[in-house]
Amino acid sequence: MSSLHNDKILILDFGAQYTQLIARRIREIGVYCEIWAWDHDPSEIAGFGAKGIILSGGPESTTLPGAPVAPQEVFDSGLPVFGICYGMQTLAAQLGGATEAADQREFGHAEVDVVAADALFSGLTDHAGASRLNVWMSHGDHVSQVPPGFTITAVTDRIPVAAMSNEDKRWYGVQFHPEVTHTLQGQTLLRRFVVDVCGCQTLWTAANIIDDQIARVREQVGDDEVILGLSGGVDSSVVAALLHKAIGDKLTCVFVDTGLLRWQEGDQVMAMFAEHMGVKVIRVNAADRYFAKLEGVSDPEAKRKIIGNLFVDIFDEESNKLANAKWLAQGTIYPDVIESAGSKTGKAHVIKSHHNVGGLPEHMKLGLVEPLRELFKDEVRRLGVELGLPRTMVYRHPFPGPGLGVRILGEVKREYAELLAKADAIFIDELRKADLYDKTSQAFAVFLPVKSVGVVGDARAYEWVIALRAVETIDFMTAHWAHLPYDFLGTVSNRIINELRGVSRVVYDISGKPPATIEWE
């Protein structure tokens, strides 16, 4: 590990939905951290070399037998400890205090009164003339009695212990969630713990991460050649830019143009990487193969498999032509790493598997290069900007691995894909013009394989239907449909119907997630 990783925080995950958010907040402060499951081998804690430990929230109850606990090594380590929500409850229960189940859960906005100043709370307030903070609560149980040596530092009118600390041991606990933006002073509390109490330097910045990764990649691959599957998505684009900076023309990218990409995306990828940045890119025009394989297939899962498997076959064919390649680069990011670790312990909440392209075949005897595997998505984007990629590319909306293949309901045909790509481009173009693109989390068009009656000139015509979908979400686990202005939707509809032959009707999807998923298939 480089000096960038010397000052770091360990987060033990008790299964809360907010755990990754804690890690992202600490990274934003400029400090490296990792998430381990609460039942990770405790003998590895000392070797990890953290400057402090955070115990996350979780869905369990400390009042029930068999509840998850922090390993004794946490308290024997001499390190500062910060328990959040369930983390504070287990801190209290394990150190000689008491917790109890409440009659009802407390969820949402709350106000806490700071009753004793410590290293975290000293001087903080959200209310003039009162030591009161606006926070976000999400708990059932609460601490009813603090352990020996602890002081109550905050209370609410509903619970006797909203925060507690043992300053001699540098152990702290809060019942609320400082990582959520609704807790107005949350980032200050985390910064005070990580920087002031734990003494971490803030070295985790985009520029330092790039320098560190360049050094690590050069050390890993030496003079060998590396291949990368370039999709045009954010992760693979940032990997391409980073590796090009590290090893220059020892990197070869394979870009498979499936015919299921965004409008003119193949040309844009080539212009960006091959022409503008000088990256070696092999473009494989595979649309004919994809449409042939997809003919007559309407089941979404079958379509996904065909699209994923064909990508692997084509990538395999191309990599076999590159006899000197010893390494395969991939855009694996930290949430992928956490997810596979979580599914091993069985304790962490398993998140729905996403449509990343299927795994590459076992027989490809290549070493793996994964320069983004320590990074969250927002960090990957910041790296992209730092590397000089256009902001419009780095911050664009997610696009599914199978591309338009899962946005054309039922059978996929070339004519459908071309119509849909153009309709989608019109929608995105208008969103950007109206300054609405960055206000939505994801927006796209869907091709519906049904014909609807319309009037063209004086004649009736049966033509296709395009659905528009736009959502607002923080984490893509839940989403609200975006309340786009009617005039705006009218403009988009008029353009699609007037500019695209074969479309007579445009509809807007007003379903939330749940019950609907964001994508239609």
UniProtKB/Swiss-Prot annotation:
GO CC aspect terms: cytosol
GO BP field: GMP biosynthetic process
This enzyme's EC code(s): 6.3.5.2
Pathway the protein takes part in: Purine metabolism; GMP biosynthesis; GMP from XMP (L-Gln route): step 1/1
Record keyword Ligase present: yes
Pfam families according to UniProt: GATase, GMP_synt_C, NAD_synthase
Keywords (A to Z) from UniProt: ATP-binding, Glutamine amidotransferase, GMP biosynthesis, Ligase, Nucleotide-binding, Purine biosynthesis
Residues binding ATP, per UniProt: 231-237
Principal EC category: ligase
Domain of life of the source: Bacteria
Gene Ontology MF terms in the entry: ATP binding; GMP synthase activity
Residue intervals of the Glutamine amidotransferase type-1 domain: 8-203
Known catalytic reactions: XMP + L-glutamine + ATP + H2O = GMP + L-glutamate + AMP + diphosphate + 2 H(+)
Catalytic center residues: 85, 177, 179
Record-annotated GMPS ATP-PPase domain positions: 204-396
Subunit structure: Homodimer.
Protein function: Catalyzes the synthesis of GMP from XMP.
Protein name: GMP synthase [glutamine-hydrolyzing]
Gene name in the database record: guaA
